[in-house]
């Protein structure tokens, strides 16, 4: 069992959890993820690690309520326990002094992006950060990213704060010498940024946490096409070359499960059980 030592709502429907997990904290590096299960009947939920405190023996994850299982997780309180926490999984992000790194985060994935940005900063990189969300009220970790980055830009889909959308990056890429780009967020965000950086030949790394079950590559649920190869996000990633990922295929596969997620969420809201 893994105890929740800290739980706080960052914005509506997005919550931060700090779990007591000394064994995982001791091994965690930025870019890795965990798979948690709330109880015996629970689904496996993959979440990118947003922080680790070896001294306290804790790891931090941030969860967005989008379905039955994440809604159930969000209902837990400090002091509650979950059954399983498997990790750290996946390959750590490559960390060295690249020069100038552009870190683009969207939605809930700004949280693990901050974890990576801290590590890039410690390696001596100059950081340009972009924090994005659907609307101003959904933005998270703006102040924290501002404290790490040399420059920070804010973007929202509806233009309620900062730039509207990510098209402003086209101009930024023209005037800045950027050596590496890290993108964490919705699939469409990673696809858009990868398309914008492609003409400049800037190495662009995307963090893929698609559908996962076992986290060890045996189930094949997390397969992605990268270049001409089929790879598995849980063991080969989760970081991949954004210019090689087949985003159209990935988005189509993820949409296959949308109806089931909606049905499970309705059952959960009604107090029923869906398997």
For each feature predicted by the language model, list its residue ranges.
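Ferredoxin-reductase
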Residues: 1-78
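Structural signal for conserved beta-strand scaffold positions within catalytic alpha/beta enzyme cores
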Residues: 6, 51, 154-156, 206, ...
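A generic structural signal for residues embedded in beta-strands
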Residues: 36, 84-85, 224
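Short, surface-exposed secondary-structure boundary micro-motifs
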Residues: 39, 87-88, 227
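Short, Lys/Arg- and Gly-enriched loop/turn segments at beta-strand edges
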Residues: 42-51, 89-99, 234
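FNR/FR-type flavoprotein reductase catalytic core
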Residues: 68-214
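Local cysteine-cluster metal-coordination motifs and their immediate loop/turn environment
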Residues: 112, 187, 209-239
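Short Fe-S-cluster ligation motifs
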Residues: 232-236, 240-275
